From Swiss-Prot:
<comment type="similarity">
    <text>Belongs to the SIS family. PHI subfamily.</text>
</comment>
<dbReference type="InterPro" id="IPR046348">
    <property type="entry name" value="SIS_dom_sf"/>
</dbReference>
<dbReference type="InterPro" id="IPR001347">
    <property type="entry name" value="SIS_dom"/>
</dbReference>
<dbReference type="InterPro" id="IPR017552">
    <property type="entry name" value="PHI/rmpB"/>
</dbReference>
<dbReference type="GO" id="GO:1901135">
    <property type="term" value="P:carbohydrate derivative metabolic process"/>
</dbReference>
<dbReference type="GO" id="GO:0097367">
    <property type="term" value="F:carbohydrate derivative binding"/>
</dbReference>
<dbReference type="GO" id="GO:0016853">
    <property type="term" value="F:isomerase activity"/>
</dbReference>
<dbReference type="Pfam" id="PF01380">
    <property type="entry name" value="SIS"/>
</dbReference>
<feature type="domain" description="SIS">
    <location>
        <begin position="46"/>
        <end position="198"/>
    </location>
</feature>
<protein>
    <recommendedName>
        <fullName>Uncharacterized protein APE_1940.1</fullName>
    </recommendedName>
</protein>
């Protein structure tokens, strides 16, 4: 599947809209690169945790951590016992719990160390990363590969951008991985809704009613 995004002439030269279109196109094209079997195993493990009333603990560093927080929030709306590792109010990880580790590189030391500890106490570790052969990917029970910018793709992008007259990447650093993971996890939430028979009204009732 290869799609093109057409911008109105008035927006072609605007950096905000050009960047938005680049990110959207990357996310759409990444769909074919994400393995269905990996996704089904990940969703199935989440369903097991829900039905067995176990805990889901999500972790990530930096912007990946923010993506993880958004995912944990939606899991809470579905009725999961979900937490974000690193927050002040987090219960201990037990056997049968699921730890979801988000790291584009799969090498972030604090994430790898926490995943190793989770494995030692008997938890299942699911990694979302661009590099399945990374330290995080190798130690995880479940790996979902989500595309992101790599060293080789940077070189390919460089020559393509030279031809187009674009000399700087429009989506810097880990932006493409983080945004793609965010959309992917929203898809996971909808899959869980259908599997568990949960509708939007239920989620609305689970939403916080005392907010700052």
């Amino acid at each position: 599947m290869q799609l093109n995004i057409y911008l109105r002439d008035s927006k072609l030269s605007h950096p905000v809209f050009k960047t938005m279109s680049e990110i959207a196109l990357f996310i759409i094209n990444s769909i074919n690169e994400i393995d269905v079997g990996q996704v089904d195993r990940f969703v199935g493990e989440l369903e097991r945790v829900y039905r067995e009333k176990r805990k889901v603990l999500v972790m990530g560093a930096g912007r990946s951590g923010l993506v993880g927080k958004a995912f944990a929030m939606r899991l809470l709306h579905l009725g999961f016992n979900s937490y974000v590792l690193g927050e002040t109010i987090v219960p201990s990880v037990r056997e049968g719990d699921l730890v979801v580790a988000i790291s584009g590189s799969g090498r972030t030391k604090v994430i790898v160390t926490a995943a190793e500890t989770a494995k030692q106490v008997g938890a299942t570790v699911a990694a979302i990363t661009t590099y399945p052969d990374s330290p995080l990917g190798r130690l995880s029970d479940i790996v979902v590969r989500v595309p992101g910018r790599t060293k080789s793709s940077k070189m390919d992008d460089y020559f393509a951008r030279q031809i187009l007259g674009i000399h700087e990447p429009l989506a810097p650093l880990g932006t493409l991985f983080e945004d793609t993971t965010m959309v992917f996890l929203d898809g996971v939430i909808y899959s869980l809704m259908t599997r568990l028979g949960i509708d939007e009204e239920y989620m609305r009732n689970m939403h916080a009613n005392v907010e700052l």
